[in-house]
């Protein structure tokens, strides 16, 4: 009779005697692979974290950022985003991929190595009716949710799982009425909801129906999630209409007693990735680059920016950049707390 234990290699014996943490064996992590080595920060960044190469005089955290795990939408790996955030001197970085937490493990590992505080969230697709592939501009509204703490992360993970199970591959089914069944009002207090990009409920209503309807849409969010748990998102990608929209959004925020906050609605780490992002958009829509050109943004703007850059862009809205840093640090926690 024997225990049939496998042989223990000397390196494992040495690790145990040295009291070093165990190396991950993958478990059920979607980010783990025997072919993927543990993340090692570039020497220029790892030399002296949390010091940054680019010292920004204005504190800032990016709260709306898509990685390559937003399939054919984000153009940079989580590690690239964390590294660029460190170079720019950001206080914190949120990864908000579409309808899932697919890249959070890789993001957390890289951010920990480069000294960036981590915020976890997702951009949920609401009321998507047409799930056919190849759309240049897919339908459905977006709800941007950040977890304030590990409890909020667990609630958001459960809601995402329910939506994925209720839908089909690549097309989770999520409505606001579903949210009432999947999460209690107390659990929603552990979320911070941003009004989101142009497909967010409030900006989309503002564009299509005007300020009065947008005010009602914002009121529906504050009624559901609580005024203190909603922030009005401003972004500026250089379009002439961005300032017009931001002026209207700030006015809505003031009237509703909700704080406005700056983001850059990031889809790639730096301007060099813009061409890759355009190619991905063409692949997603099953069009050539010539055919998709009219749908693409005119400016190379959806990349990470420093606090100084954002402060210049949002000079007409004092405090919105600094408020992003405050919210980012308030929502930041290490992913190890979830395990």
Predicted region positions:
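Phosphodiester-processing cores and adjacent nucleic acid-binding clamps
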Residues: 1-339
């Amino acid at each position: 009779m024997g225990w049939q234990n496998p042989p223990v290699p000397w390196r494992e014996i040495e690790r145990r005697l040295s009291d070093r943490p165990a190396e991950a064996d993958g478990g059920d992590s979607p980010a783990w692979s025997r072919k993927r080595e543990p993340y090692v920060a570039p020497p220029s960044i790892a030399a002296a974290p949390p010091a940054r190469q680019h010292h920004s005089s204005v504190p800032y955290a990016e709260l709306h950022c898509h990685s390559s795990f937003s399939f054919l939408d984000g153009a940079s790996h989580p590690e690239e985003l964390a590294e660029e955030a460190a170079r720019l001197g950001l206080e914190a970085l949120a990864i908000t991929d579409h309808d899932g937490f697919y890249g959070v493990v890789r993001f957390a590992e890289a951010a920990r190595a480069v000294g960036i505080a981590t915020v976890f969230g997702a951009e949920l697709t609401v009321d998507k009716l047409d799930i056919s592939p190849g759309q240049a501009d897919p339908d459905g509204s977006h709800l941007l949710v950040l977890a304030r703490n590990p409890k909020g992360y667990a609630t958001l993970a459960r809601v995402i799982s329910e939506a994925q199970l209720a839908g089909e591959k690549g097309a989770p089914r999520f409505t606001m009425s579903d949210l009432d069944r999947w999460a209690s009002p107390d659990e929603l207090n552990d979320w911070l909801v941003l009004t989101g990009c142009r497909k967010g409920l409030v900006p989309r209503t503002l564009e299509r129906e005007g300020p009065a309807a947008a005010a009602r849409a914002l009121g529906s969010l504050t009624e559901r999630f609580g005024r203190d748990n909603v922030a009005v998102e401003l972004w500026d990608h250089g379009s002439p209409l961005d300032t017009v929209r931001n002026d209207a959004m700030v006015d809505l925020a003031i009237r509703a007693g909700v704080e406005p906050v700056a983001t850059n609605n990031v889809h790639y780490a730096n301007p060099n990735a813009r061409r890759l992002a355009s190619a991905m958009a063409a692949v997603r829509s099953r069009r050539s680059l010539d055919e998709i050109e009219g749908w693409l943004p005119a400016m190379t703007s959806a990349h990470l920016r420093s606090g100084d850059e954002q402060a210049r862009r949002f000079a007409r809205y004092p405090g919105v950049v600094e408020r992003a840093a405050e919210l980012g640090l308030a929502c930041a926690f290490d992913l190890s707390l979830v395990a």
